[in-house]
Amino acid sequence: MPKIGMEPLRRRELIDAAIRTIGQRGSLDVTVAQIAHEAGVSPALAHHYFGGKDKLILATMRHLLRELGQDLNAAIGRTETPRERIAAIIAVNFSASQFAQETIAAWLTFYVHAQQSEDTRRLLRIYARRLHSNLVFALEQLTSRERASRIAEGAGAMIDGLYIRHALGADAPNAASAIALVEDYIAVQLMGEK
């Protein structure tokens, strides 16, 4: 008989275990049994909650995106100026929960998987559109809409690129350095603007 109220806790444990397992292996070449073992639950329970590896992977991506969105909304809520909003968007993308070694490796794996999975590709497109629209909203208060869109596209590419570089490197991710690079890029692009 399942314990009442345990499902959300077990789901979260499995999602966290999926991030760790995928991050450690650097690929989606993992089994539900390996993820379940990492979470300390039975493979049958993992299948019961998620119905299979693909659904567990998608739930893991959704979790990371939801966490990013919640952190972003909280950070933006504390800003007063467009430049503060831009800084908050950048900082959240390199927060400790997102820019950890295993999470970075998991994100890189999701990008590779998107070439074969329409569901994964759709989630990554949603992420890219949200990042772009959040940046454009703040940037167009400082420059033209056309320039704001181009600057946002460049900043998004830098953020993704820094994830890729850190996924391939042996050193621990340096969030402060990554934030400074993206902020410097935007500052240079805005020189001479309002």
Swiss-Prot record:
Pathway listed: Amine and polyamine biosynthesis; betaine biosynthesis via choline pathway [regulation]
Annotation: DNA-binding region: 31-50
The entry's keywords: DNA-binding, Repressor, Transcription, Transcription regulation
Biological process according to GO: glycine betaine biosynthetic process from choline; negative regulation of DNA-templated transcription
Statement: the UniProt record of this protein carries the keyword Transcription regulation: yes
Coiled-coil segments on the chain, per record: none
Residue ranges constituting the HTH tetR-type domain according to the UniProt record: 8-68
Presence of keyword Transcription regulation: yes
InterPro entries: BetI_C, DNA-bd_HTH_TetR-type_CS, Homeodomain-like_sf, HTH-type_TetR-like_transc_reg, HTH_TetR, Tet_transcr_reg_TetR-rel_C_sf, Tscrpt_rep_BetI
Source species, domain of life: Bacteria
GO molecular function: DNA-binding transcription factor activity; transcription cis-regulatory region binding
Matching Gene3D superfamilies: Tetracycline Repressor, domain 2
HAMAP family: HTH_type_BetI
NCBIfam families xref list: betaine_BetI, PRK00767.1
Function of the protein: Repressor involved in the biosynthesis of the osmoprotectant glycine betaine. It represses transcription of the choline transporter BetT and the genes of BetAB involved in the synthesis of glycine betaine.
Entry protein name: HTH-type transcriptional regulator BetI
Organism of this sequence: Brucella anthropi (strain ATCC 49188 / DSM 6882 / CCUG 24695 / JCM 21032 / LMG 3331 / NBRC 15819 / NCTC 12168 / Alc 37) (Ochrobactrum anthropi)
Gene from which the chain derives: betI
